[in-house]
Amino acid sequence: MKIELNRDQIKYIAVFTMLLNHVANIFLQPGTFACEALKDIGYFTAPVMCWFLVEGYRYTRSVKKYAGRLLIFAVISQLPYYLAFARNHLAPWYTLNMIFTLFLCLCLMIAEEKILDPGKKSLVVLGIIAVSSICDWAILAPWYTLWFYRAGEDPKRRKKAFFIAALVLGITVTAELPGAAGIAAGAGAMIAVLAAGGCVLVFYNGKKSQKHFLVKKYFFYVFYPAHLVILALLKI
């Protein structure tokens, strides 16, 4: 019997892997096996969220409401993000949380669709990617979004997009640690992205959960700032 996962189930997995990544960053010693392993597992989250952002953009009834929801919860989440990361010297004080990054990724898709002039489009897209450098999931999340968006419905292009995403992240992570540790961390990061690709390209049934729709719709938006507050309090 074929294993199937709906959108919400995949998002729950992504939320859990994000939590593991945050626990590793906040509480564990950098460079240790446990820390790097949990961080690598957490690399599953960004491509999944970018994938469903692309899907959400394509099927939402109102892009304005979608963007507004992202922006509102990005603002709500900023203080919890600061308390969990910047206050603990894990990110510069001005770093914006990943919901801001997703908002920028949504803006990127709007530009990709609405701006017809290739030159202007390239400038705006590159500008949005540059702005993301002060956010969590900097640079990479906008590229993920762009690759997934441009892949459209073509299965081969979708697989290629995930392979490129895995390769780029693997190289990036490998460069952060010396020698064998860097290679191992990079390989783990690549596996996480490829696992994300497997979830959405192989096991995703294209459906969302029909039960408690409103609760599940806002679960991630509420969980994100709430878990950051809890982690920040535990770190005190």
What are these regions (language model features)?
Residues 1-236:
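Alpha-helical transmembrane segments and their immediate juxtamembrane cytosolic regions
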